[in-house]
Amino acid sequence: MIDAVIDIGSKTIRLSVYKVIGDEVKNLFNEKSSASLASFIEKGMMNEHGIQKLINTLKEFKNLISNFEDISKTYAIATASIRNSCNRREIIERVRTEVGIDIELISGEEEAKLSFLGSGIDSQSGILTDIGGGSSEIVVFEQGKVVKTSSLNIGSLVAFDNFARGLFITKDEKKLLEDDIKLMIASNNLNRVQHDLVCAVGGSARACLKLYNEYYDKEAGNVIITMDGLKNLINTLINMENRAKMKLILKVKADRIHTLIPGMIILYRIAKYFYADIIRVSMTGIREGFVYNKILERG
């Protein structure tokens, strides 16, 4: 059985194709588009430009999917980008009519649980975070099971839109962003229990890891970020001359030139809240979790 999963995020729309054999999932194909849908939100609604960007991207993905002869099912899931839009019903109907794809809205709690399920984390207890473009999910798990989830209305793209006046966030803007993140975490009544390790999933975390490995000359397969190293890297980037900063980020992750640093700040503040020493980045997440969940539903 082969399934296609389209993940409609606030910054990136991703297509992944998986081959499912029993309870094993093999990734066959990946494609992405940096649609930045959160940038098209005006007065709580996605404007026509954003809706058209979404529709055009989904048409392109549908065309790619048609190249696979044995696709059993195509799923499209949407997180904060559409979930938080007042005109989400209109968006879903437009996509159904113009593209022929049904979008399934994923709540913040569902998003957190699916990210945990797909992370492949082997620790029995700890914290998992998924930093998206429009929201950040936090999962507290014990004995291998989710015991609490929390969704923060801040992601890398929203942070950039709300706090940065230029291409890069400044020292003063960083302080305002950090204060906002701390207030959001505190308002979610998360117990501040120490966890030495935080697991991170999602595009922001992977981009952060890639920059971290480049800056500290780590091996390509490294998935560990130390808190001291991340703090130093963030401060170095904040104080770095813009041209040098641009050159470094363009080399590593060009499509995240404006959102990478805000995403790193969010990741750091969440991990620091739980007194973590290290962050381990998983290469899998919500899409894999969604497929695993479908396997469980099928029995």
Question: What function would you assign to each model-found segment?
Answer:
Residues 3-7, 126-130, 198:
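Short glycine-aspartate micro-motif
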Residues 31-35:
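A structural signal for short, well-ordered beta-strand segments
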Residues 17, 40-63, 67-71, 79-125, ...:
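Helical "lid/coupling" subdomains associated with nucleotide-phosphate turnover
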Residues 1-25:
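N-terminal basic/disordered segments at the start of proteins
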Residues 23-28, 145-147:
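Beta-strand initiation motifs
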Residues 134-140:
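Acidic, divalent-metal-coordinating active-site segment for phosphoryl/phosphodiester hydrolysis
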